[in-house]
Amino acid sequence: ECMSIWSRFIGTRKSEETNNVIGNQIHMCHMMPSRYAIVDVEIGLKDHKIHDIGALRHDGATFHKSSKEELFKFLGDINYVCGHNIIHHDARYLFTDEACRWLLVDTLYISPLLFPERPYHKLVKDDKLISEQMNNPVNDCEKAKDLLLDEITRWNLLPNEKRRLFASLLKDKKEFEGFFSMVGAEYINEGVSELIRNLYVGKICQHADLDMLVRQHPCELAYALALIATTDYRSITPGWVLHNYPGVEFVIKLLRHASCNEGCVYCNSQLDVLHNLKAFFGYGRFRTYEGEPLQEQAAQAAVKG
């Protein structure tokens, strides 16, 4: 696999509260990355070898051959090599003999964070790019570029605190670090749990063990929080995310479906059975059977799992 070169490109500019992920050799443009290329590799299903390579450079130049060596010459002195699932697919075949000189930007993993709501992103279905032409890597590069620029635009539309939260959770993960470098993301090393509580008041249990989740399940937590912030109740976590990060469901259960004993804004409203009986059905109390509140007990048991 391609070696991480995070330390080669990335420095941290410290302020009183935040660190800024910046490129030491790059002047960041928050609306449009400067020196980058999109790469797509076609692999044979039987021989697992490279059959075709497409690339699209920031200056509009294209590449369409099957030679890795010629591709590397085409890439030249760019800073970022981008692609859809490039970390765990294309890079595995491109950088088998030598270390990767470029910082990798993967459009796949950041997409569910930035487009968590139905109908998600128009160019992505499951974990694949939607393309009009089969087996045309240059066309796939054009689609990946469109997706990347949409992701950068959406990132810059997020509130500052939401951007800081995602970057703080995921800054050390190779699937995200290239994108965060490209957009000049800021992050904090401490106080992430408190930031989550402030951003998600009334949306999650305020007594959930966020410190543990930040420490042990940062990716799953980020995807869960992105989904929780949606307004369309039909929105779901993509299947490929659950396959790679099965802990997402555990995190959502901990944040949203485990009523705390202390009581908080979320649990007192969303997980209180009497409150919801009144809100949804207009009744102030459950029926009893021979003096026993069996309906209420069943509802409480369902809430507690």
Model regions and ranges:
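N-terminal accessory regions of nucleic-acid-interacting proteins
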Residues: 4-34, 106
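Repetitive beta-architecture junctions, highlighting loop-to-beta-strand starts
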Residues: 34, 50-51
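Two-metal-ion RNase H-like nuclease active-site motif
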Residues: 34-44
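Conserved DEDDh/DEDDy metal-dependent 3′-5′ exonuclease domain
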Residues: 47, 54-155
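Acidic, Mg2+-coordinating catalytic module of metal-dependent nucleases/exonucleases
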Residues: 123-215, 219, 224-225
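Interdomain "pre-motor" coupling segment immediately N-terminal to P-loop NTPase/helicase cores
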Residues: 219-282
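Conserved pre-motif I regulatory segment
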Residues: 273-305
